[in-house]
Amino acid sequence: MRGFEERFGYPPDDNLVVAASRPGGAVILRELGGRVPSGVVGFFDAVEEISLPDVWNGYFLGPVDRVVGAYADESPRFITVEGDVVEVLTIGSDGGGALYCVCMEEPAPVFRLDQASIRGGVATAPPGFTRQIAPDFSGFLEALARAVESSEQGREQPPF
């Protein structure tokens, strides 16, 4: 990460994209009964996890076992969006406690959920703290790539 140490006064941590050592998409399909968005399945077939602690506040996706575990533990399994309760899969988080959740139904929009309380598997956040950040999973990955680029360029505000 060019210029990181000059900007922050310490060297960057390990920022990693770890290739899958097993077909993680198949694991998710098996554990969740085949109801997972196709983009998520394809992603975890190729990537075990993404760990970017030095990009903005940090971005963390996966690993598969954590994603499946969060769903099984209902942490959360549903979110409230504009008064509707929708089923989600929590695919990651940032370093500040926000969760990234993808809707289980296609086109599978991705939401950033911040300051949420979880009761009975349903996450509820204060008004304005559940925000759709991408229309689908591939759009989320594109936005994440832009976040990495803007962080490396030293921009002031993260895109999400």
Question: Which role fits each region the language model picked out?
Answer:
Residues 1-99, 152-160:
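A surface-exposed partner-binding patch
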Residues 60-63, 103, 127, 136:
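Helix N-cap / beta->alpha transition motif
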Residues 116-146:
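Compact, glycine/acidic-enriched structural inserts
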